[in-house]
């Protein structure tokens, strides 16, 4: 081209004279130019293809982790070129958080991407569903410069010899596991302030890249000096986890009885998962002395000290000497039911013999208190002592102090089955017993027909720690009067020769009340047992005893046995009674007794709300029935006794019945928290009622 330009005028004249030569020159020129352009394009294609191949190799190497799992492999991404690494800066890196954040650099590179199709800048970071800036610790810039692309094969070995804290799989639980289980040689300093964050990567590489990363090692030494004592304490406790795993506001304080050298948080929680494993934490047991002073009313019901719980609760509730019950009522037997010797006295007690022989009926209170749940005594304590008869004698059937802890069902201790009306571990609401005081003989056969309706035998002995009780010591009784100490299940009449099987769950004797229709019978003779039968309307078909016992376990279980020529007083109210109750009947088949079932069904609406016992006197009574008891009952709220009933000795059932509760009574009885504030006030209140 330059030569033709230099010989321009001469060639022009020659071409004019020789046009063929000129055209040949033009053709040669074009051919040469075409060859040059072809060679140039060839060179450019070679260059472009090599560039593309190199970039493809790089992308394939760095993208291999993305194709394998959803999370990038931190090892391989962290060792690429600087241009691949710059978007990986964590925003925690305070010096570079604005300049080198991934989003900012992506915005700067977008125009350059569109300019040339050959310059494909790496878009592989976008393919990860998570932003890698939050998945990997911030790489130190000096460490990145130490690993150029050319040195990668030499340093592959070091990558795979990194400590276990960097060898993570693609899951969040692996991140937690690797952070929670650092190797002993890894000096991972935990969450440090952002100014010393670059040294975290140095902690992982400590001991393996000593020659290459001296500055990082100095940072580590400074870090160890920077850790003040409170830092060390914080690192040893629950804060030694990455910032993403920190649980705010949970402070685990060691208890005083825990040894000081036991770490509160174990160093290794290696079961995996995104949440820390709390199974190795040794939480101290609850304090033996409760912090709240009111909690002493309800002591721990879980040991062998259930009898002390009972006495403690009773003393708190003011059940002490001054109940106004008359001179012969033995209050200490009620106050500490196991320790007092009056409970150990047997049927040969002179008071009991006197009650057998005297024509005047006496109330023989056989108090065999189980270890009552504290909640049952805490609300209404001892409702049955409101009869106020002056000849109440508390020497009970001798109660042995063996707490039945293994096989005792909810109502383990009381040998009186009337006090086990609901026997399902899920239900704990005690059915109300509107106790019949059957004056005169009743039809035991009709009650015997209704008695085989079963208890629901679904009681489990696991509730024995809730209500541990005092079984009846039947060794001193005659064999025809013994009761199984753990009676429940189908309630049939007591077979008098039944041996005292301690863990019998088959035979439920009905309310063996020692009812003797004639006053002079010896105690060895077989008595007529007062029986309890359900009213038959409970919705459970053949299991009318299967009643909800939701709120309270069995309360104060007492039995007042009244023995007189023709009357028998059967009193066994649970302290908390909700639901239908039981009507007792006694004696042989005579006397119209059909009315008290209807009377009970009329009273059921009261008994569902009230928690006091409904006492119904049924049957014809002899004039020898105690007028003192009638007068005392007339003073108790909820009973109406007519004057003719008092004159006749409470002759008919209609004379003494429970009036429907008013709205005030319902609210007062249905509120389980309506405790009187002072035990002395409650004591005086009960004494006033009984006078």
Swiss-Prot record:
GO biological process: cellular response to cAMP; gluconeogenesis; glucose homeostasis; positive regulation of CREB transcription factor activity; positive regulation of transcription by RNA polymerase II; protein homotetramerization
Motif, Nuclear export signal: chain positions: 271-287
Major site of localization recorded for this protein: cytoplasm
Marked site: Required for ubiquitination and degradation: 627
Highest rank taxon of the organism: Eukaryota
Function of the protein: Transcriptional coactivator for CREB1 which activates transcription through both consensus and variant cAMP response element (CRE) sites. Acts as a coactivator, in the SIK/TORC signaling pathway, being active when dephosphorylated and acts independently of CREB1 'Ser-133' phosphorylation. Enhances the interaction of CREB1 with TAF4. Regulates gluconeogenesis as a component of the LKB1/AMPK/TORC2 signaling pathway. Regulates the expression of specific genes such as the steroidogenic gene, StAR. Potent coactivator of PPARGC1A and inducer of mitochondrial biogenesis in muscle cells.
Subunit structure: Binds, as a tetramer, through its N-terminal region, with the bZIP domain of CREB1. 'Arg-314' in the bZIP domain of CREB1 is essential for this interaction. Interaction, via its C-terminal, with TAF4, enhances recruitment of TAF4 to CREB1. Interacts with SIK2. Interacts with 14-3-3 proteins, YWHAB and YWHAG. Interacts (probably when phosphorylated at Ser-171) with YWHAE. Interacts with calmodulin-dependent catalytic subunit PPP3CA/calcineurin A. Interaction with COP1 mediates nuclear export and degradation of CRTC2.
PTM-bearing positions, type Phosphothreonine: 169, 192, 501
UniProt xrefs under InterPro entries: TORC (IPR024786), TORC_C (IPR024785), TORC_M (IPR024784), TORC_N (IPR024783)
Record's keyword annotation contains Zinc: no
Residues recorded with modification Phosphotyrosine: 488
Covalent link Glycyl lysine isopeptide (Lys-Gly) (interchain with G-Cter in SUMO2), residues: 234
Name of this protein: CREB-regulated transcription coactivator 2
Localisation per UniProt entry: Cytoplasm; Nucleus
Phosphoserine modified-residue sites: 70, 86, 90, 136, 171, 274, 306, 368, 393, 433, 456, 489, 492, 611, 621-622
Keywords (A to Z) from UniProt: Acetylation, Activator, Cytoplasm, Isopeptide bond, Methylation, Nucleus, Phosphoprotein, Transcription, Transcription regulation, Ubl conjugation
Modification N-acetylalanine occurs at: 2
Family according to the record: Belongs to the TORC family.
Location of Asymmetric dimethylarginine modifications: 51, 99, 120, 123, 161, 168
GO CC terms of this entry: cytoplasm; nucleus
Post-translational modifications: Phosphorylation/dephosphorylation states of Ser-171 are required for regulating transduction of CREB activity. CRTCs/TORCs are inactive when phosphorylated, and active when dephosphorylated at this site. This primary site of phosphorylation, is regulated by cAMP and calcium levels and is dependent on the phosphorylation of SIKs (SIK1 and SIK2) by LKB1. Following adenylyl cyclase activation, dephosphorylated at Ser-171 by PPP3CA/calcineurin A resulting in CRTC2 dissociation from 14-3-3 proteins and PPP3CA. Asymmetric dimethylation of arginine resisues by PRMT6 enhances the association of CRTC2 with CREB on the promoters of gluconeogenic genes.
Biased composition (Polar residues): 1-20, 174-186, 447-468
GO molecular function ontology, one term from the record: chromatin binding
Chain intervals with Low complexity compositional bias: 335-383, 390-411
Chain segments carrying region Disordered: 1-30, 174-195, 280-306, 335-491, 513-543
């Amino acid at each position: 081209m330059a030569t033709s330009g230099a010989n321009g005028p001469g060639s022009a004249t020659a071409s004019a004279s020789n046009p063929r030569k000129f055209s040949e020159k033009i053709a040669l020129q074009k051919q040469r130019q075409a060859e040059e352009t072809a060679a140039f394009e060839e060179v450019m294609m070679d260059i472009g293809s090599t560039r593309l191949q190199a970039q493809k190799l790089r992308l394939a190497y760095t993208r291999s982790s993305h194709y394998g799992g959803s999370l990038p492999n931190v090892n391989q991404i962290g060792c690429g070129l600087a241009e691949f690494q710059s978007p990986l800066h964590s925003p925690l890196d305070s010096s570079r958080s604005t300049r080198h954040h991934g989003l900012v650099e992506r915005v700067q590179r977008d125009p350059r991407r569109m300019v040339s199709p050959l310059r494909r800048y790496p878009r592989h970071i976008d393919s990860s569903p998570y932003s890698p800036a939050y998945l990997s610790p911030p790489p130190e810039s000096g460490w990145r410069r130490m690993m150029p692309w050319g040195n990668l094969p030499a340093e592959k070995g070091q990558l795979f010899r990194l400590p276990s804290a960097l060898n993570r799989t693609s899951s969040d639980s692996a991140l937690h596991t690797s952070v929670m289980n650092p190797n002993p040689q890894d000096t991972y300093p935990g969450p440090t302030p952002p100014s010393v964050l670059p040294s975290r990567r140095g902690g992982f590489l400590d001991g393996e890249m000593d020659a290459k990363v001296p500055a990082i090692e100095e940072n580590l030494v400074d870090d160890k000096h920077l850790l003040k004592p409170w830092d060390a304490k914080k690192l040893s406790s629950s804060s030694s986890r990455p910032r993403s795993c920190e649980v705010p506001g949970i402070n685990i304080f060691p208890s005083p009885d825990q040894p000081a050298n036991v770490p509160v948080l174990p160093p290794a929680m290696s079961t995996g998962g995104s949440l820390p494993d709390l199974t190795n934490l040794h939480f101290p047991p609850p304090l033996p002395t409760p912090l709240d002073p009111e909690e002493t009313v309800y002591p721990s019901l879980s040991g062998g000290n259930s009898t002390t719980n009972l006495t403690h609760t009773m003393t708190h509730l003011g059940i002490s000497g001054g109940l106004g019950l008359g001179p012969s009522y033995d209050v200490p037997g009620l106050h500490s039911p196991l320790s007092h010797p009056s409970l150990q006295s047997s049927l040969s007690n002179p008071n009991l013999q006197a009650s057998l022989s005297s024509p005047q009926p006496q109330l023989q209170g056989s108090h065999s208190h189980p270890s009552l749940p504290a909640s049952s005594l805490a609300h209404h304590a001892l409702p049955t002592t409101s009869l106020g008869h002056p000849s109440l004698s508390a020497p009970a059937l001798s109660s042995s102090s063996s707490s039945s802890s293994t096989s005792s069902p909810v109502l383990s201790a009381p040998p009186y089955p009337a006090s086990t009306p609901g026997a399902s571990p899920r239900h704990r609401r005690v059915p109300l017993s509107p106790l019949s005081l059957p004056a005169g003989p009743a039809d035991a056969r009709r009650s015997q027909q209704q008695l085989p309706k079963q208890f629901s035998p679904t009681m489990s002995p696991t509730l024995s720690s809730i209500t541990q009780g005092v079984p009846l010591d039947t060794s001193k009784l005659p064999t025809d009067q013994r009761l199984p100490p753990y009676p429940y299940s189908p309630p049939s009449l007591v077979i008098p020769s039944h041996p005292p099987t301690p863990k019998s769950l088959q035979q439920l004797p009905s309310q063996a009340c020692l009812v003797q229709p004639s006053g002079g019978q010896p105690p060895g003779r077989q008595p007529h047992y007062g029986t309890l039968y359900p009213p038959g309307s409970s919705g459970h078909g053949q299991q009318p005893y299967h009643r909800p016992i939701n709120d309270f376990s069995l309360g104060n279980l007492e039995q007042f046995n009244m023995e007189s020529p023709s009357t028998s007083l059967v009193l066994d109210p649970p302290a908390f009674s909700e639901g239908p109750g039981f009507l007792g009947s006694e004696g042989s088949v005579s006397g119209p007794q059909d009315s008290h079932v209807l009377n009970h069904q009329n009273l059921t609406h009261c008994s569902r709300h009230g928690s006091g016992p409904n006492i119904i006197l049924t049957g014809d009574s002899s004039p020898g029935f105690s007028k003192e008891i009638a007068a005392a009952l007339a003073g108790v709220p909820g009973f109406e006794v007519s004057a003719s009933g008092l004159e006749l000795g409470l002759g008919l059932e209609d004379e003494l019945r429970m009036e429907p509760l008013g709205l005030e009574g319902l609210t007062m009885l249905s509120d389980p928290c309506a405790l009187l504030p002072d035990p002395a006030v409650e004591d005086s209140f009960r004494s006033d009622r009984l006078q």
